[in-house]
Structure formats: structure tokens, C-alpha cells
Amino acid sequence: MGSSQLSTLLFFTIVVTFLTVVSSGRDLPGDYLRLPSETSRFFREPKNDDDFEGTRWAILLAGSNGYWNYRHQSDVCHAYQLLRKGGSKEENIIVFMYDDIASNEENPRPGVIINKPDGDDVYAGVPKDYTGAEVHADNFYAALLGNKSALTGGSGKVVDSGPNDHIFVYYTDHGGPGVLGMPVGPYLYASDLNEVLKKKHASGTYKSLVFYLEACESGSIFEGLLPDDLNIYATTASNAEESSWGYYCPGDKPPPPPEYSTCLGDLYSIAWMEDSEVHNLQTESLQQQYKLVKNRTISEPYGSHVMEYGDIGLSKNDLYQYLGTNPANDNNSFVDETENSLKLRTPSAAVNQRDADLIHFWEKFRKAPEGSSQKNEAEKQVLEAMSHRKHIDNSVKLIGQLLFGIEKGTELLDVVRPAGSPLVDNWDCLKTMVKTFETHCGSLSQYGMKHMRSFANICNAGIPNEPMAEASAQACASIPANPWSSLQGGFSA
């Protein structure tokens, strides 16, 4: 069998596999989650605007680029519109997004971004504070700390908060154990983020801070790292060991409009925003939203466990303190079980964050005319992505076997520490191991983040960098020639 025949066979094997993934779980019972109607149980009487003290600040960050990651920038744009309708001022909302989606040649509605199938444009009016190469971890830290002198490029907008102010941070992208993606430069590491949060607290420049985090293994960003005495409350889309999920994807119920070939949003993000859009947020607490989002986000055989960290006592605060509230929802303080009942759609389908790019490439292939350059390009994209995945998985597995032996290698790389423990003891070691691997094996990319636990366990086992470098060089005799494996964008650490 020739190489072209093998490629074609591999491609259609991939297609069949992922069609099975996409179509699984479509007909689960219970399409809707009906919210309780007991006012006293879930909601309180609204407070007067005059009771609010301080200023609301927000940072909204989409940590990816590429049209296949449409959903992350869509999430951020939606969050911006939600905050503006809630009364937050543009000058107090700082937006980080690569801004390569709205005008992308693949976007079927040029200049428009939507976050749900029948949704309005959420892109119009969104400020471009930090875009393109300006979207990196150091600028995010500088903006959060209010350190204008540390910024590179961008609008110069920072969180210039005072001791009575309330800060809302929302991040959405790919992640892995202990790490969050960034489109430019090194990834954001949990240790660095938590040190920045401690520094912000030490500056005395906020009263409370809420962090909503959408990413795979996002619980690992705060697990064992975020103290409970910083006046910070965080919720995450998943625990420290599992994926988060794309939503409103091709094949979902409901699907995106037929002209779209990508996921429009993410399940956790859609859940908290769609809840916020229909309630008077003066009468709903962070804890109540956490429970509602948690219930919506977990569903077998997919879904994830939404988690909470930090100062759990802050969760009694009203959402209004951080998101404001839309005056149109003033009367939406509770749910009537009959005529006025609110139905939050539970997921009848969702897509693993790490597979959403493959869904996009398959949709491109499926829709492209036979024999067209578009069809050939889509096939190439799938094969390159799968080649990269196979290379990364096999390389990490072989490195584990070289370091720990054939029988114990995989087992030791996959060890999960007890709940409440951070991913790794020495974060500098983790960064060194990542850079060593990428030097010999090419970029981890958004997919390879899943192996961060393996590198952390190599550090936890006390393996020095020299044998790691030798094992990496032996495991990676060659690197696939494709964009995913390229180090053109720099190292991940």
C-alpha cells in the first residue's frame, strides 16, 4: 500500500472515530434543568444601588488564537456585553483577545461574533485593549497589578483599583495540569498566577476579587495554591484532573447555524453567562450561581466538575457586586414553576476542549466540494494535527519508560497527588522539564498541555535535568514538520 493510500485510510479512520465521539450522548433524557421557584431558598430581596460601595473592575482574557478556537474570544466578547449591560463602565473593563476571529476569512459573518446559535453579535463595541502579540502573561499580570510601567503595547489600561473596589477576572482557553494557554510567549503557570494574586492582596487595592476560570484541568491552577485569606473566591470549569467542554458545536443540540464549522462557546462559560443574563443579580449570590452552573455543567458521559477555591465565605456576596445587573431583569428574582418557568438547557452533547479543533477540520472537509483545494487543505490539517498528537503522546510515553523503566514508566507519569496538594513541589523544575522536552521534541501546543502532569511527576521523583535531556533526545529522533510542532511561537515555559 502506497503512502498516499495509507494517509487516506488514516484520515477516514480518524473521521469515523470522531463522528462517533460527536454523536455520542445525543439522546440523553432530561433536556432541561428547571430551576427551583422557592424565593427564600435561592434569592433575596434586592438591595438599593446606594448600598454599593467602591468601583467594579474586570479583566476578560481569551488565551488562544486560530479560528478553530472561535469559542474563547466569543466567550470574552459575550462577557463584555454582559458587564456593560450590568452598568460597568468601559474604562473599568480590560479586554485581552488576539482579535483574529471577527475578520477571519473562515468567519461566515464577517465582522460578527456570536456565542450561541440564535445569539446577537457580541463583538460590536468590544474594546481592543490588548490584541495580537500583546496578549501574554506578563501584560496580564501588569494589568491586574495596576503596573502601567510593566506593560508592553496595548491601550495602557490597568486595574487602578482602591481598597473598597471589587474585581472580576474571567479567563477562557485551553489548559493543562498547572498551566493555562497564551497565544504569545510562555504559558501562564499556576505558581506565578497565585504569587501575583498574593501581591495584589498585599497592595491593599481591592475589597474582594472573584476569578472565573474556563480551561481543562483548571482546578489545578488553585488546588493547594490559593490561600483562603486573600479575599479571593475562584470557581473553575473542571477539577484538577479532567477536561472542560466546548458547547454549541457542530452536531450538538442545538447546533450552531449550518454555515459555522466550529464551537461557538464553552459549557461552563455559557452556563454562568446565560444564568446572569436572566436574573436580577442583586438577588442572586455567587454561591447560588456556582451551584446552578455546577449542576448544568456535569452530565455523563461528558461534562466536568465545577469547583470552588479560596475564600468560600465570599460566595455569599451578590453577583451584582462584580457583574452589575441589567435593569431589564429587575423583576426576575425567582422562577415560577408554571407559566414563567425558566429553563436552563442541560447539555445534550458537548465536545472535549482538546478535540474541538478536529471537529472544525472535519466540518471543513465534509462541507468542501469534492476535489477542491479547500477539501485537500482540510484533510491536510486533520492529518497534521493527528500526527502531532501521536508524536507528543508517544514521545512522553517513551521518555517515561527511559527514566523509570518499561513497566513503571506510564504508571509513574500518570500519578495524581492527593486532593489539596499542588501539582508539583518545584515549579521552576517543571518549567525546565517543559523547555527541555520542547528543545528536543518540538512544541507541546494546546494539545500537549495534557502532559504537564507527566513533567511534574518527573520533577516530584527527583529526576535531574540531564537525564531528562538525554531521554528526550533519544525519544525524539525527529520532529514532525507541521505548524503544531513548530517552536516559531517560542517555548511554553
Curated annotation (Swiss-Prot):
A cellular component term, taken from the record's GO annotations: vacuole
Any GO BP annotation: vacuolar protein processing
Signal peptide: 1-19
Residues annotated as glycosylated: 147, 295, 331
Organism: Vicia sativa (Spring vetch)
UniProt keywords, alphabetically: Disulfide bond, Glycoprotein, Hydrolase, Protease, Signal, Thiol protease
CDD domains: legumain_C
Name this protein carries in UniProt: Vacuolar-processing enzyme
Function recorded in the entry: Asparagine-specific endopeptidase involved in the processing of vacuolar seed protein precursors into the mature forms.
Site (Required for post-translational maturation and enzyme activity): 263
InterPro entries the UniProt entry points to: AE (IPR043577), Legum_prodom (IPR048501), Legumain_prodom_sf (IPR046427), Peptidase_C13 (IPR001096)
Residues spanning the membrane: none
Active site residues according to the UniProt entry: 174, 216 (nucleophile)
